[in-house]
Design a protein with these regions (language model features):
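GH16 jelly-roll
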Residues: 2-251
C-alpha cells in the first residue's frame, strides 16, 4: 500500500454493490485507497443516491432498497492470489463506532459457502449491544448454506480495560495456519485455535477439508446488517486503516 491511489490491481479486486448479510453499505471502488503508505477503507453516508438494482415489490433485500444510504469497500485477492498455509499478518486500526463491522478474513474457491471454508482472522461488531472482537472458522454441514462454526468472541473490554486508548492505536492480527491447525492471534495473544482434524465438510462438501486447500484474502468495512447493529451517523465517515498485509510461507 506504499503508492498513493488505488491498491495494486495485480493483487486486489473489488466487490461491487450490496454483497452480504443485509448490510447497509453499497460496495464500490472509490472508498478504498492508499495514502501515506496505508490502505484506507472509508464508509460514507450518501444523499439521494438511487440503488441501480432497485425493483419495486422485490423480496430480494439487494433490490428492494430504493436508495443507497451508505458506501464502503471490500477488497479481495480472489482470482489473483490464493494461499495454502503460512503466517498471515495484518497491522490495522479498526473503527469501533456504532454499526461498524470491519473484518480480515479468507474464503476458499471452487465450492459454495460454507463448504469452501471461511476463516475470520478479525471481526469487530456488537453482540447484544456490547462490542466484541471475534476470531472464527466455518465449514460445511449436510445442509446448504448452513455452517459449522468454531468461534471465539472476546468482549472489547478485555482489551480496553488494559489500555483505554486501544481503539486509537494500530494492532497486529496474525494467523498461523499449517497442516494441523489454524491459530488466530491479536498482538501475540492467542484468541482461537482450530484443529484441522475437526474441520471436515458434511455431505454437500463431500467430506473434504476446506482448510487443506488454498484460500484468498478479503479486507472490508461493512455497516449494520445482521451483525453490525445500529449505525451511529456521528461516526461517519468511518475509517478502517491498514498499515500492511504480509503472508509468509515455507519454501
Amino acid at each position: 500500500f506504499n503508492a498513493d491511489g488505488l491498491p495494486d490491481t495485480a493483487v486486489w479486486s473489488y466487490d461491487n454493490g450490496f454483497a452480504r448479510n443485509e448490510e447497509a453499505q453499497w460496495y464500490q471502488e472509490g472508498n478504498a485507497y492508499c495514502k501515506d503508505r496505508k490502505l484506507i477503507i472509508e464508509a460514507r453516508k450518501e444523499k439521494g443516491r438511487k440503488n441501480p438494482w432497485y425493483e419495486a415489490g422485490s423480496n430480494d433485500w439487494r433490490k428492494k432498497r430504493e436508495f443507497v444510504e451508505y458506501t464502503s469497500s471490500c477488497i479481495t485477492t480472489s482470482g489473483k492470489k490464493e494461499f495454502l498455509y503460512g503466517r498471515f499478518e495484518v497491522r490495522a486500526k479498526i473503527p469501533v463506532s456504532g454499526g461498524a463491522w470491519p473484518a480480515i478474513w479468507t474464503l476458499g474457491s471452487g465450492m459454495e459457502w460454507p463448504s469452501c471454508g471461511e476463516i475470520d482472522i478479525m471481526e469487530y461488531y456488537r453482540i447484544k449491544g456490547e462490542p466484541h472482537i471475534l476470531a472464527n472458522a466455518a465449514w460445511g454441514t449436510d445442509r446448504q448454506w448452513s455452517a459449522k462454526w468454531k468461534s471465539k468472541a472476546i468482549p472489547f473490554t478485555h482489551f480496553t480495560d488494559k489500555d483505554p486508548q486501544w481503539a486509537d492505536k494500530f494492532h497486529v492480527w496474525r494467523m498461523d495456519w499449517d497442516e494441523t491447525a489454524i491459530k488466530l492471534y491479536l498482538d501475540d495473544e492467542l484468541l482461537n485455535e482450530i484443529p484441522l482434524s475437526e474441520t471436515i465438510n458434511g455431505t454437500i462438501g463431500m467430506g473434504t477439508n476446506p482448510f487443506r486447500k488454498p484460500q484468498y484474502l478479503l479486507l472490508n468495512l461493512a455497516l449494520g446488517g445482521i451483525n453490525g447493529g445500529e449505525i451511529d451517523d456521528k461516526g461517519i465517515p468511518m475509517r478502517y486503516e491498514i498499515d500492511y498485509v504480509r503472508v509468509y510461507q515455507k519454501q
